[in-house]
Amino acid sequence: MTESTFAVETFSMDSMSPSPGAEIPRLTVSPADTTLKFEDLVPEGLPKVDTPKPAEKKPVKKRKSWGQELPTPKTNLPPRKRAKTEDEKEQRRIERVLRNRAAAQISRERKRLEIEKLEGEKLKIEQQNEFLLRRLSQMEAENNRLSQQVAKLASEIQTSKSNPGSPASASASASTSSISATLAPSTSPTLAPVLFKQENDLLDNIDSIPFTINPDPSTTTTTTTTTTTSNNISSTSSTTLSPADLDHSSATPSDLAQHPAAVFHLNIPLLREHDHVHPPPLSDADLSRLFDADSSSEPDLSFLEDGFSLELLPDSDLGPFAFDSLVDLGPDEDNQQQQQQLQQKLDDSIGFPEQTPLPASGLQPSFGASLERCDEQGIAAGAQ
């Protein structure tokens, strides 16, 4: 009994377990379609209940507008003190907002001025650019025109070289003059054969200009006429010359400085550089007359025999007479002044154009010397 029961149970378990080679069937209906929802269970007559939604985020506080007036701070906190209470923090916030507004206003003003400056520079540069473009177009047109004229002139020059007597040579010269006047009308002359012809005519006329001088001492008139054919213009110049003017016309500035009397037509004989006449040397009689002109009587030469008395000197001071002999061979200040006066008199009486001083030893005798050269050579101061 027991074995039969165990065999039936084993058979039933084997029939229920799937075979290892059998495939699992696939589902043809979605599980979501078979799931019941809460809305489907509620009857149609009853109102639907809204489900609660999650809480929304708190909106961010927007920035206040610039035109909004700030409240007056309730506290008066010093600048360097730390804010602790809410009123003090509000005061710091208001001060910060005011500083930011002022800085923003300054920044906007600076940007506005900079933009205006850049716009002005832009307008100025645009105007300059337009002007330069117009100038460039004008210069290009002028350059093209001149290039055409140069090419035409080159062809005419080649033609004139091949045929010198043809009318093309004359037109080439005219074209050369016109181009020269066009390129530099105020700085360069007209390069034409007429210019060189005029220069040759002027050189020829210079040699043929007459200069006539009458022997009469009165002023004479010499008329010089020079006629040039440059651009059909004739010039006539009249010059009044005198013998004195002709003499001084070729004088150098140094000659005029040395002869002031001749320049002002004074009645003093004029001596040219090649007509200098030196007077003969002065004799002893002339020297005696010149030196003794101020004295009423001849000099007293008795001290040469009797000697010089020292009693005449105050306190017997021999300082000024520190010499061994009675002859002073060196010139003193009085002698130099007298020599200068004598030289001036000689120049005024003779009329030298240049002052040439004579040797000092031959003009003035020293102290104690004879005027008639009767002493020995060692004593006479005037001996050479």
From Swiss-Prot:
Induction: Expression in up-regulated upon exposure to itraconazole. It comes from the Eukaryota. The keyword Manganese does not apply. It is found in: Nucleus. It holds the Pfam family bZIP_2. Residues 1-18 have a biased composition (Polar residues). InterPro entries: bZIP, bZIP_sf, Hac1/HY5. Signal peptide: none annotated. GO terms for biological process: positive regulation of transcription by RNA polymerase II; response to unfolded protein. One of its GO terms (cellular component) is nucleus. Keywords: DNA-binding, Nucleus, Transcription, Transcription regulation, Unfolded protein response, Virulence. Residues 1-27, 41-94, 208-256, 331-384 are annotated as: Disordered. Residues 92-101 are annotated as: Basic motif. Disruption phenotype: Leads to changes in the cell wall and cellular membrane composition as well as an increase in susceptibility toward azole and cell wall disturbing agents. Presents significant defects in important virulence traits like thermotolerance and growth on keratin substrates. Also leads to changes in the pro-inflammatory cytokine release during host-pathogen interaction, with an increase in TNF-alpha and a decrease in interleukin-8, which might be related to differences in pathogen-associated molecular patterns (PAMPs) in the cell wall. This is Transcriptional regulator of the unfolded protein response hacA. The lineage of its organism: Eukaryota, Fungi, Dikarya, Ascomycota, Pezizomycotina.
